[in-house]
A protein has these predicted regions:
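Structured interface patches
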Residues: 1-184
Length: 184
């Protein structure tokens, strides 16, 4: 999903009217891929999003959601695709834009970019929630050996015939210290 093109809009006119009716729906997720920093990650599985929107007073909305997604993210060592589960269970309180004027704080943080007038953009909301839960490091297993820096062979699947270049020559002093330590 590009942050600019989004399809799923939820009508908030009943919530923002004087009656302040709440919205409680199950919404199908149309997101088939997740784009981040120029890379595309496939959405492997997705449940419906259960979303609730209610008026929280003082021109604020309380947005709650619950869903599960699985996204294929490459292992940081061997580049094999790893299914990563995102269990999204969130509640956000956001300010509404009164007469088209947003608060300066909300503009700076861009924390409610998924509410535009009387519509809530479900795809942008999901994008933001996935982004918050995005893992810092993804490994296929704790003992992943990665890939050969010379030929690119996945070392989990077998060894390669490249010569072991050993340590960086600048690290030879440290290697010698460890050799001397082992001899003692």
């Amino acid at each position: 999903m590009n942050r600019g093109d989004s399809i799923m809009l939820l009508d908030l006119s009943n919530v923002l009217s004087e009656q302040h009716k709440s919205v409680d729906k199950n919404v199908s997720i149309s997101m088939d891929e997740f784009r981040l920093r120029g890379k595309t990650y496939p959405v492997l599985s997705k449940d419906e999003l259960h979303i609730q929107v209610e008026y929280a007073g003082d021109q604020k909305l309380r947005v709650s959601g619950l869903t599960n997604l699985t996204i294929g993210i490459p292992c940081d060592r061997c580049l094999e695709e790893v299914p990563v589960d995102f269990k999204l269970d969130f509640t956000r309180e956001v300010e509404t834009k009164e007469a088209g004027v947003a608060s300066d704080e909300a503009d700076q943080l861009d924390e409610n970019n998924y509410i535009d007038g009387y519509h809530l953009d479900v795809e942008k909301l999901l994008y933001n929630e996935i982004l918050v839960g995005w893992p810092m490091k993804v490994l296929c297993s704790e003992d992943c050996k990665g890939i050969c820096s010379v030929c690119g062979q996945n070392l989990n699947e077998g060894t390669c015939s490249c010569e072991d270049t050993g340590l960086d020559p600048r690290m030879s002093v440290i290697r010698d210290v460890f050799k001397n330590f082992k001899e003692v």
